UniProtKB/Swiss-Prot annotation:
Localization terms from the record: Nucleus; Nucleus, PML body
Keyword set, alphabetical order: Acetylation, ADP-ribosylation, DNA damage, DNA recombination, DNA repair, DNA replication, DNA-binding, Isopeptide bond, Metal-binding, Nucleus, Phosphoprotein, Ubl conjugation, Zinc, Zinc-finger
Phosphothreonine sites (modified residues): 189, 200
PTM per Swiss-Prot/TrEMBL: DNA damage-induced 'Lys-63'-linked polyubiquitination by PRPF19 mediates ATRIP recruitment to the RPA complex at sites of DNA damage and activation of ATR. Ubiquitinated by RFWD3 at stalled replication forks in response to DNA damage: ubiquitination by RFWD3 does not lead to degradation by the proteasome and promotes removal of the RPA complex from stalled replication forks, promoting homologous recombination.
Name of the molecule in the record: Replication protein A 70 kDa DNA-binding subunit
Spans annotated as Disordered: 116-163
Record-listed N6-acetyllysine modification sites: 172, 176, 268
Top-level taxon of the source organism: Eukaryota
């Protein structure tokens, strides 16, 4: 039984720091360590059959093995990947990055052999003496089986028993001279590469090898204390992730050199407590570049992971606090066109686009892209979207906003994306989806997801609750009421109040309390739309009316004044044209009479491919 473990492996791991070996060890004990609000960490006491060591730490991505009961006291496991970290006081910690449980705790049932605590001061001779003493007095577990043959160590190195090689497929002998694991910076001093998870503000000399998963644009500021600029990075290695920020001179120095998805050695930055309000990075600390910071390319970093996600289900967003930062993954069920808006705080124009993401829960969330992300987004093939660090808003339910610090990946190469794509292609695309976002003030009202026929909207009493309801439908225009559909409005940008003709060449706006030599036309169009089953009167304001008529309001105003016949033809040509309508319905009371008011929020040409696909899916669902 003792031969089943990689005897001598602990010494090789600690003394030689040879991380290429894959030892087979037994878990003796597991102890959780409190980490505040972070994910729990687990400290392990492990045995190689010869020695025990309590300085094993489990990487957080392996926590599920403990929490699921696979990794437990007495189980035997093979370590596939580990890192040795030297603490400030000289003690060494082995961080287990990847391991496989070979025999469960139930199958093993007890401690294998009589291992003794490992002491770094012991030489190999003392350990061999201990081993001989153990073999002379077999343990109850090993007395029942003949001792396994074990090759003698050669040139001062420890071998691994052949029984273990047969049982677990491990054949590489321990004791092979290990590399230094040191980085030689340009200054000539050696710095040890340490995992990100081990960084603390109390360390002065350190180097990490990390992949850049996100790089912000350069941002500037100006206030009473001066002005400056900055950019930030998100870095990841096998142990965790960290955010780094460069200011002023460091921006000029490092911004042109660092590329997203490349791997670099980072040395000597200032570490401080992280501000979680502005970052979704899972680390209690963040890094700031300074005059001593060094960044060197690493050509051998292909093994490092890419972006680390901790996904929140769309259905779980309703329990998240306002302004919380979350990682989300979903299929782009539908999307709006990019529009330009002016940010009031700095009077700067920026692009904005709403997309509607759905996951396997069938829930849909409105997600807003900004700037370059909004302009370049292509949702025509309904891609999988993974977003790290989106901000939760509570406006009208729950919605998300992508920040400048967020990471957006289209069709990421991760298992969750493949699973979601398979589900959507096989069954998800037939679902209407249930929106957790309710944009009551306009827009697409939560996305084109709540598909209804006009008959379904009426029979389900949509709009008769306390809040307005939204639905999407495909219908044809059957009648347009052109009488009084246009009015002369205040020409100022933010005012649409009807003006009064002063009969002296001026037009007065009561709201602005001003007179103007001109006006602009505004439109409120009543339309009757119908599908195969039902019809509905709807009100169309400026943009939706223009989309139906195919002409802008100013041109229509000129036609009405100069060419009544051409004006009539515009309305006639719009009849019997089909559109996809996004409609808001709400019960309103006027003069003691209650009725459902239907307002068109958005009008788009029918995507007949998508429409046909949904009809076929509905037919199959009802067969």
């Amino acid at each position: 039984m003792v031969g089943h473990l990689s005897e001598g492996a602990i010494e090789v791991m600690i003394q030689q720091e040879n991380t290429s070996i894959k030892p087979i060890l037994q878990v003796i004990n597991i102890r959780p360590i409190s980490t505040g609000n972070r994910s729990p960490r687990y400290r392990l006491l492990m045995s190689d059959g010869l020695n025990t060591l309590s300085s094993f730490m489990l990487a957080t991505q392996l926590n599920t093995l403990v929490e699921g009961g696979q990794l437990a006291s007495n189980c035997v496991c093979q370590v596939h990947k580990f890192i040795v970290n030297t603490l400030k006081d000289g003690r060494k910690v082995v961080v287990l990055m990847d391991l496989e449980v070979m025999k469960s705790a139930e199958d093993v049932g007890l401690k294998i052999g009589n291992p003794v605590p490992y002491n770094e001061g012991y030489g190999q001779q003392q350990q061999q003496q201990q081993q001989q003493q153990q073999q002379a007095v077999p343990s109850p577990a090993s007395a029942a089986t003949p001792p396994a043959s074990k090759p003698q160590p050669q040139n001062g190195s420890l071998g691994m028993g052949s029984t273990a090689a047969k049982a677990y497929g491990a054949s590489k002998p321990f004791g092979k001279p290990a590399g230094t694991g040191l980085l030689q910076p340009s200054g000539g001093t050696q710095s040890k590469v340490v995992p990100i998870a081990s960084l603390t503000p109390y360390q002065s000399k350190w180097t990490i090898c990390a992949r850049v998963t996100n790089k912000s644009q350069i941002r500037t500021w100006s206030n009473s204390r001066g002005e400056g600029k900055l950019f930030s990075l998100e870095l990841v290695d096998e142990s965790g992730e960290i955010r780094a920020t460069a200011f002023n001179e460091q921006v000029d120095k490092f911004f042109p050199l660092i590329e997203v998805n490349k791997v670099y050695y980072f040395s000597k930055g200032a570490l401080k407590i992280a501000n979680k309000q502005f970052s979704a990075v899972k680390n209690d600390y963040e890094m700031t570049f300074n005059n001593e910071t060094s960044v060197l390319p690493c050509e051998d970093g292909h093994h490092l992971p890419t972006v680390q996600f901790d996904f929140t289900g769309i259905g779980d967003l309703e329990s998240k606090a306002k302004d919380a930062l979350v990682d989300i993954i979903g299929i782009c069920k539908s999307y709006e066109d990019s529009i330009k808006i002016t940010v009031k705080s700095n009077n700067r124009e920026v692009a904005k686009r709403n997309i509607y993401l759905m996951d396997m829960s069938g829930k849909v969330v409105t997600t807003t892209l900004w700037g370059e992300d909004a302009d370049k987004f292509d949702g025509s093939r309904q891609p999988v979207m993974a977003i790290k660090g989106a901000r939760v808003s509570d406006f009208g339910g729950r919605s998300l906003s992508v920040l400048s610090s967020s990471t957006v990946i289209v069709n990421p190469d991760i298992p969750e994306a493949y699973k979601l794509r398979g589900w959507f292609d096989s069954e998800g695309q037939a679902l209407d989806g249930v929106s957790i976002s309710d944009h009551r003030s306009g827009g697409a009202g939560g996305g084109n997801t709540n598909w209804k026929t006009l008959h379904e909207a009426k029979s389900e009493n949509l709009g008769q609750g306390d809040k307005a309801d939204y639905f999407s439908t495909v219908a044809a225009v059957v009648f347009l009421r052109k009488e009084n559909c246009m009015y002369q409005a205040c020409p100022t940008q933010d005012c649409n109040k009807k003006v009064i003709d002063q009969q002296n060449g001026l037009y007065r706006c009561e709201k602005c309390d001003r007179e103007f030599p001109n006006f602009k036309y505004r439109m409120i169009l009543s339309a009757n739309i119908a599908d195969f089953q039902e019809n509905q009167w709807v009100t169309c304001f400026q943009e939706s009316a223009e989309a139906i008529l195919g002409q802008n309001t100013m041109y229509l105003g000129e036609l009405k004044e100069k060419n009544e016949q051409a004006f009539e033809e515009v309305f006639q040509n719009a009849n019997f044209r089909s559109f996809t309508f996004r409609i808001r319905v709400k019960l309103e009371t006027y003069n003691d009479e209650s009725r459902i008011k239907a307002t068109v929020m958005d009008v788009k040409p029918v995507d007949f491919r998508d429409y046909g696909r949904r009809l076929i899916a509905n037919i199959r669902k009802n067969m």
